[in-house]
């Protein structure tokens, strides 16, 4: 009986609010604010109506119709959306007190139409609000990526942890019992030992995983790490094993997802194609530039345009002497004398160098970004990392290299 009364009230509200069609489009567009803000959420906006706009009854009806668990008469929500000119939007929140408006997800075409509604005062890009955490003291690599300039301040400041994001470490496996990863090891794959657990017997993959998401040494301290073992105990393997690992990830990944490939070899069309297909499946792929002090465009998967290719720097912002360079790079990250987890015990650490060590810094940063923007495409993730990177600080970056150093405001 009470439910029926509520339905009747909703119906009356909507019928009253919908007594006329939305007004004709205005020749003057409503302002669009905050689109360039660092924390802007792609595709999400707050639509604020003018104080004198006759929209409150429709907003109240829509707010009631969206109440969780409330059964509503068919068509009431659609009718309220039509009255407010929101047929093409997905409404997430409705405001009737602090302001009169809605939070919506809309495509660009619908956004343009909303801006022409004369009842709209302005539209603002939705943004993230975050708590802050600081690690002090921090390893130099973490310390470097959260500040624009030297000297280092001994701190790593971060606003996200990568929680809810899945990082696939295509490498030598991971020491599953290491305390850096407690409770955050996800399902893995072993291309070296059929049916194996992807346990690391080399150390390289554990070190990489520690930089991506270790509790002490990691960029993204809450990310879920998936071991994908494609290299043996000597750190060697084949393109066929690497492609097998990529094939498994492409088929079985959980989004939001990022792949780390701190490995490579000579140019390979098959490997490049496997990487591209993983990217086309919606997985961001971060790859090492290589350690031969040569043009990265001669190496796979470093030469894959849609992947994020990473060179290495020293603690003084020089390109590391071993790091590959050139047009196929996207950015640089710390890669010399990096301390992280190791495979010899559950508490072991090691300090090593390479573009393999630079790459997981970027993978961790991608995980931070994906925590806040879980539906971001690989292209959007790459664009964000390049947008925030610090320009023109890498010394001797190498011919045709982009002079960009990883920076993490996330």
From Swiss-Prot:
Where does the protein end up?
Secreted
Name residues in a coiled coil: none
The cross-references to InterPro entries, in alphabetical order and at most eight, read: PCSK9_ProteinaseK-like (IPR034193), Peptidase_S8/S53_dom (IPR000209), Peptidase_S8/S53_dom_sf (IPR036852), Peptidase_S8_Asp-AS (IPR023827), Peptidase_S8_His-AS (IPR022398), Peptidase_S8_Ser-AS (IPR023828), Peptidase_S8_subtilisin-like (IPR050131), Peptidase_S8_subtilisin-rel (IPR015500)
UniProt-listed Enzyme Commission number(s) = 3.4.21.-
> Which terms in the Gene Ontology molecular function aspect does this entry carry?
serine-type endopeptidase activity
| Every Peptidase S8 domain range | 139-410
Identify which residues the record assigns to the active site: 171 (charge relay system), 204 (charge relay system), 356 (charge relay system)
Please give the UniProt note on temperature dependence for this protein: Thermostable.
One Gene Ontology term, aspect cellular component: extracellular space
Where does the signal sequence lie? 1-19
Which of UniProt's keywords are assigned here?
Disulfide bond, Glycoprotein, Hydrolase, Protease, Secreted, Serine protease, Signal
- Which GO biological process annotations does it have? proteolysis
The entry's comment on post-translational modification says: Contains 4 Cys residues that form two disulfide bonds.
Q: Which residues does the propeptide include?
A: 20-132
UniProt xrefs under PANTHER family:
CEREVISIN-RELATED, PEPTIDASE S8
Give the family, as the similarity comment puts it: Belongs to the peptidase S8 family.
The free-text function statement in the UniProt record for this protein reads:
Serine proteinase with preferred activity for amino acids with aromatic side groups at the P1' side of the scissible bond.
Protein name, per record: Extracellular serine proteinase
Per the UniProt record, the source organism is Thermus sp. (strain Rt41A)
What is the phylogenetic placement of the source species in the record?
A: Bacteria, Thermotogati, Deinococcota, Deinococci, Thermales
């Amino acid at each position: 009986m009470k439910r029926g009364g509520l339905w009747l009230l909703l119906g009356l509200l909507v019928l009253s609010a919908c007594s006329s069609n939305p007004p004709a489009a205005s020749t003057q567009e409503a302002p669009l604010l905050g689109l360039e803000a660092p924390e802007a959420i792609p595709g999400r906006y707050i639509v604020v109506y003018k104080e004198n706009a006759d929209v409150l009854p429709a907003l109240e009806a829509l707010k009631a119709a969206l109440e969780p668990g409330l059964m509503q008469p068919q068509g009431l929500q659609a009718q309220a959306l039509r009255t407010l000119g929101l047929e093409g939007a997905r409404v997430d929140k409705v405001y009737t007190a602090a302001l009169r408006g809605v939070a919506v997800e809309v495509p660009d075409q619908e956004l343009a139409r909303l801006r022409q509604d004369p009842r709209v005062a302005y539209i603002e890009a939705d943004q993230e609000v975050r708590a802050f955490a600081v690690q002090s003291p921090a390893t130099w690599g973490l310390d470097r990526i959260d500040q624009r300039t030297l000297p280092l301040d001994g701190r790593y400041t971060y606003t996200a942890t990568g929680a809810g994001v899945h990082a696939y470490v295509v490498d030598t496996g991971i020491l599953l019992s290491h305390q850096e990863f407690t409770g955050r090891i996800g399902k893995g794959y072993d291309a070296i030992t059929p049916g194996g657990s992807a346990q690391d017997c080399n150390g390289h993959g554990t070190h990489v995983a520690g930089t991506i998401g270790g509790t002490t040494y990691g960029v993204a301290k809450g990310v879920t790490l998936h071991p994908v073992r494609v290299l043996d105990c000597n750190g060697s393997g084949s393109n066929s094993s690497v492609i097998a690992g990529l094939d498994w990830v492409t088929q079985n990944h959980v989004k939001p997802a990022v792949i780390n490939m701190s490995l490579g070899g000579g140019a390979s069309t098959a490997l490049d194609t496997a990487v591209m297909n993983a990217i086309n499946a919606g997985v961001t792929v971060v790859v090492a530039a290589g350690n031969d002090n040569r043009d990265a465009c001669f190496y796979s998967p470093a030469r894959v345009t849609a992947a994020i290719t990473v060179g290495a720097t020293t603690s003084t912002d020089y390109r590391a002497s071993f790091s590959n360079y050139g047009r196929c790079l996207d950015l640089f990250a710390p890669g010399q004398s990096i301390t992280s987890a190791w495979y010899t015990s559950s508490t072991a650490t090691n300090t090593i160098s390479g573009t393999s060590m630079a790459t997981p810094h970027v993978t961790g940063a991608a995980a931070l970004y994906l925590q806040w923007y879980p539906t971001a495409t690989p292209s959007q993730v790459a664009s964000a990392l390049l947008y925030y990177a610090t320009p023109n600080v890498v010394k001797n970056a190498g011919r045709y290299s982009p002079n960009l150093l990883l920076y993490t405001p996330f």
